[in-house]
Amino acid sequence: MITFRGDGLYNSKFDDIYFNTNEPLIECEHTYSSVLDEINAKFIVVAEAGFGTGLNFFSTVLKFLSLNSTELHYIAVEKYPFKKSELREIYLKFEILKPFFDEFIEQYEILDGALIRIKLLNERVILDLYFGDILDAFDELSFRADAWYLDGFSPTKNPDMWSKEVFDRLSKFCKNRAKVRTFSSAKIVQNRFLEHGFSIKKLKGHYKKREILEASLEHSSPKILKEPWYALPNISKFSDVLIIGAGVAGLAAAFKFKKAGFNVCIAEKMSEAATNGSSNLAGILMPLITKPKVALGNMHMSAFLFARHFYANSPFADFCGVYDYGVNDLEKTRLSLWDSEIFKFENDFEPYPRAFIKSAAQIRPKELCMSLASEFDIKYGYEFESIEKSTGGYVVKFKNSKNIFSSLVIFAMGDVSTNLFQNVFADEFMQLSSVRGQVTHLNKVLNLNSAFSARGYMCKDVRGIQVVGATYDRNDNRSAARATDDEKNIDSLSEFITNLDVKVVGSNVGFRGYSGDRFPIVGAVHNASEFKKIYKSLLWTKHSKNNEFAVHHENILISSAHGSRGLGTAIFGAEILLDIALNRPVCTTNSILNSLNPARFLVRKLKRGLVR
């Protein structure tokens, strides 16, 4: 589909070129990124329909670095993405972009119907890249841009890109006084802008292009949310953050908020960090692979891809790859349906077909948490008791009779979050439970180059110990290790370690929070009492355009119920909370964000008329 022809990179599907080979970067700046000269803002949001090769993005990065702005947030949509190998070939011709491209391509993966986030230049540049149709992107994303680039081939070659339906939505994703640049100056494009409230002017084109278009929108259009009960909160101004819980979820959030410039205090009920589900010697960072485009699978894949960047330079991460075995027909089918560069499927392998996830990693959670904890003055022995609204924030009371004031509070309490919703936030419909998991420490049994997951999982050895696991016992609060559980863990790997000298040298028990639908609980804490009032008729009004927006407990967030894949989702959740707190575009789709929303169980009951 993609070839170099004459003076440009050619796409046979659209019978059109991506860019001219004659000074392509200069052309990109002239046509698109020069619009940044007209934007006087420290935080710039640029959106692009038609990411293509990414050349406009890199041109915008270069332009951004020449300005006094502090952060560039670039949101792009691409329906027909290039593979990694294709992009590497293309960018051999752009030596000036090599430092940016190398950082970009390490994080780039194609995930159809989903969003990936890529960070460059110590997070000064954020790229959110959605793979899919532009109209689907309008449903799945929430942002307003200072500038838009419409670069989806010419109207005659790609009419869907320039349809009335696209322009009907465009103004709802623009800030006041937003600018829109297009390479095409066709009459149909001019008319589309004028019909939708934009003013237009023609600018001189570059090289052989006579003219381009710039459209301006003085006043953006209001958005109508399809599901206003999942509306994001309005976070009040804050400077300090209290995080309750010092496991992976709490410490990841602390790390991100501290890096963003906030004063962070951590309160932990135990005498050290990572005493619960985060306490294992070793664990695996890998996605849950479902059938393609399944919401749960997309969420886990998005979380996995994002978390890799967090762990990239960590001494506690070994990017050794992970084998995921399809131990039954259902799992084999799931693995075989993907056409992805993320993993390679081997159908004829014994004892089971397997996928090799090259960029998966083995993590040492306990050591990771202790290292992160050393960066904070953590208040140990602080077990949460209650929270009270106060002027400018909250007074949080602990069972040791101590109080902490903070203007923003994040709960990351793992499996005890059930009590939080029942006793503090009055949501009796929250589906959260505690699950006991025991892992077993073996003497080094197998000389592994990569960890693997089958009926159970086995890690590479850490200082002569191999971690295998794990049991799953809901509502079992016994903290002592059990020999019978060690036997279960060993039996779950019997097809791999039969006739080997297996010795149990230790065990570890942890308790994890799980939700009723297997998605984590991440987002703003809803005001359940207000929900029950304003949505009491939701059974009949759920399709109405007049429903009120969600009401939240001001400046209270949560990250919980990360289950057995918290090494990925806890990092993902921390980024989501930071996005919400900063009121910036969120790192995932609306579908996934709604699936994580703490109010979702209450909303489902309200929709069915089951709340009195």
Swiss-Prot record:
Tell me which domain of life the UniProt entry assigns to the organism this sequence originates from: Bacteria
E.C. numbers:
2.1.1.61, 1.5.-.-
Q: Where in the cell is it found?
A: Cytoplasm
Q: Per its Swiss-Prot or TrEMBL entry, what cofactor is needed?
A: FAD
User: What GO CC terms are in its UniProt record?
Assistant: cytoplasm
- A Gene Ontology BP annotation from the UniProt entry: methylation
InterPro entries, alphabetized: FAD-dep_OxRdtase, FAD/NAD-bd_sf, MnmC-like_methylTransf, SAM-dependent_MTases_sf, tRNA_MAMT_biosynth_bifunc_MnmC, tRNA_MNMC2, tRNA_S-uridine_synth_MnmC_C
| Function in brief | Catalyzes the last two steps in the biosynthesis of 5-methylaminomethyl-2-thiouridine (mnm(5)s(2)U) at the wobble position (U34) in tRNA. Catalyzes the FAD-dependent demodification of cmnm(5)s(2)U34 to nm(5)s(2)U34, followed by the transfer of a methyl group from S-adenosyl-L-methionine to nm(5)s(2)U34, to form mnm(5)s(2)U34.
State what protein this is by name: tRNA 5-methylaminomethyl-2-thiouridine biosynthesis bifunctional protein MnmC
Source taxonomy lineage?
Bacteria, Pseudomonadati, Campylobacterota, Epsilonproteobacteria, Campylobacterales
